[in-house]
Amino acid sequence: MKLNEMRKCSLILLGVIFSVSLNDLLGENKYTGVKHIEDEITKERIIKHLDDYRDMISYWRLYPDKFIDYLCSLNPDNTFHFFFYQRVFLRAIMRHRYVYATFVRAWSKSFMSVMGLMIKATLYPGAKLFTVAGGKEQSAGILSSKVEEICKLIPAFAKEIEWDTRGTNAKTRQTKDTVVYQFKNGSTLENIAASEKTRGRRFQAGLMEECVGIDQDVLNEIIVPTMNVSRMINGQVDPNERLNKSQIYVTTAGYKNSFSYEKLLQIFCQSVAKPKDAIILGGSWRVPVVEGLLSKDFVRELKLDGTFNEASFDREYRLLYSLNTKNCWKLLRVA
């Protein structure tokens, strides 16, 4: 369907219907001044514009940054704007099933990764998503802080979450080491433990935060198998749906003889053999410096600091994996 044929459509989004033209939706990503009016959702309205809704949701799944641009346009006091590399990252994690991203400090990797999961939870009703890190309390802190930050910057996201925790049904819960967000469309986003306690759980997609700290056996034997069940649509599975079994690995650089480095090489080989399924992403300190997220003077001072280990600087800011000399020496002695 051409854009001019879809000129006026009522957009169902976040529990309310907004009157907006598709050209406004897909055009320039600025606040248009259009006054959005809340109205009652009816089954008849949904059926009448169902094809239009399908087209828009399909578009947003491929261009998630445009979805965020639209949500921001609903807020006249919006202050959130993407950097170019953040748009690239969002599109990559929505279009590929396997993503390995190695980024430096101040790259906003956790912020963007959690935003990607929230987009998936919104655009894929009934999705079961998780985050995991080396420690459960660590993953709970990352998830809760980033969701809270995103909801403040983009209030429309807050309307997608069931915040009432007083009901008998399990909804949004937040404790020291457990965070569960229940979305109004049936999706859930939670943190899980990198331990035997997670065995038997079922999800469709997950984020491995700071995967350099996750145990190899736990990841392969417990975490990855939780994603063996695909999302059902009307009782059927779409084999082409990118959500199913999608895995995002995010970390800073570590050691070359570690499991995380082997996983990086594995997904790199997958990206060569099947470029539509896997992708490798990376960025040094220069990217956040160019965008103003990191001070160049701060980086220069770190490089000149005699107490700062050069190998640590290479891992944290130059995206260079180090050779673990201790393990290497043990291997030489055994040989």
Task: Label every model-predicted segment.
Residues 2-335:
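Phosphate/NTP-binding elements of NTP-utilizing enzymes
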